[in-house]
From Swiss-Prot:
Gene3D superfamilies: DNA-binding pseudobarrel domain (2.40.330.10). The keyword Lipid biosynthesis does not apply. SMART domains: B3. Keywords: DNA-binding, Nucleus, Transcription, Transcription regulation. It comes from Arabidopsis thaliana. GO terms for cellular component: nucleus. InterPro entries: At2g31720-like, B3_DNA-bd, DNA-bd_pseudobarrel_sf. The keyword NAD does not apply. This is B3 domain-containing protein At1g20600. One of its GO terms (molecular function) is DNA binding. Residues 64-73 have a biased composition (Basic and acidic residues).
Length: 237
């Protein structure tokens, strides 16, 4: 092999030139691979950005739904019997059971034959359970003060002090009896059923808005507990 001057070149110089060219080619290939890897990393970052934005958007929507749900929860007012519910939250079977339960009532006049007692028990105390009634940290069923004053307190014995607590028998949906206490908390301001209520909730799996309790007439037994010392729970779920 000859150079530009026409003189032959040594094999050593030729080998060095070939080695240099190969080294340059290898470096160029390595540089190109690094560029491709960098582009892939950028693509991954770009691709993950929409996912991150979607995730953040979902989190914001979830927080908005939680805030909306909290706003829609019923406020605690004096009449604990009041609760706003959405009829679409219930299945057709549950709605049918609720309707049947409300309609299946005996005529109190046929039972008592007394106008005054009939007036007091024309409708028993009924309550749709609220979240505070089934929360594990509450351990009580809140009752309507107005209804308790009209339909329960007048029928207590003189020896029965609701402030200290009155023993009551509570009937479950299956007819089983559990002993609890009816009390007036905060002096005589807040009527509650306690001392065993949460166990009752757990035993029958009672849920807010889906289950009801009643004191007074138990239509299935064709009987009325006129002293307010017995309570029955009707599970509609």
């Amino acid at each position: 092999m000859a150079n530009s001057t026409g003189k032959p070149t040594s094999s050593t110089q030729e080998d060095e030139e070939v080695t240099y060219i190969l080294a340059q080619l290898m470096q160029d290939v390595m540089d190109r691979e690094e560029d491709i890897d960098d582009e892939d990393d950028i693509d991954d970052e770009v691709a993950s950005l929409p996912l991150l934005l979607v995730s953040q958007a979902n989190q914001k929507q979830s927080r908005k739904r939680e805030e909306k749900t909290e706003k829609n929860q019923p406020k605690r007012v004096k009449n604990q019997n009041i609760m706003k519910i959405n009829i679409h939250d219930f299945s057709e079977e549950t709605l049918r059971l609720i309707e049947d339960w409300y309609n299946a009532e005996l005529d109190p006049q046929d039972i008592f034959g007394d106008d005054e007692v009939t007036r007091r028990f024309s409708r028993p105390i009924k309550k749709q359970l609220m979240s505070s009634d089934v929360d594990t940290d509450q351990s009580r069923l809140m009752l309507s003060k107005e209804q308790v004053k009209e339909k329960m307190l007048p029928f207590l014995e003189e020896s029965e002090d609701p402030v200290k607590g009155v023993d009551v028998s509570v009937y479950g949906p299956d007819g089983e009896v559990q002993q609890m206490k009816f009390k007036m908390w905060n002096g005589d301001k807040t009527p509650v059923l306690t001392s065993g209520w949460m166990q009752f909730v757990a035993d029958y799996g009672l849920l807010k808005t889906s289950d009801f309790v009643t004191d007074g007439k138990v239509s299935q037994l064709e009987h009325v507990f006129i002293r307010g010392s017995k309570v029955r729970c009707c599970n509609t779920s």
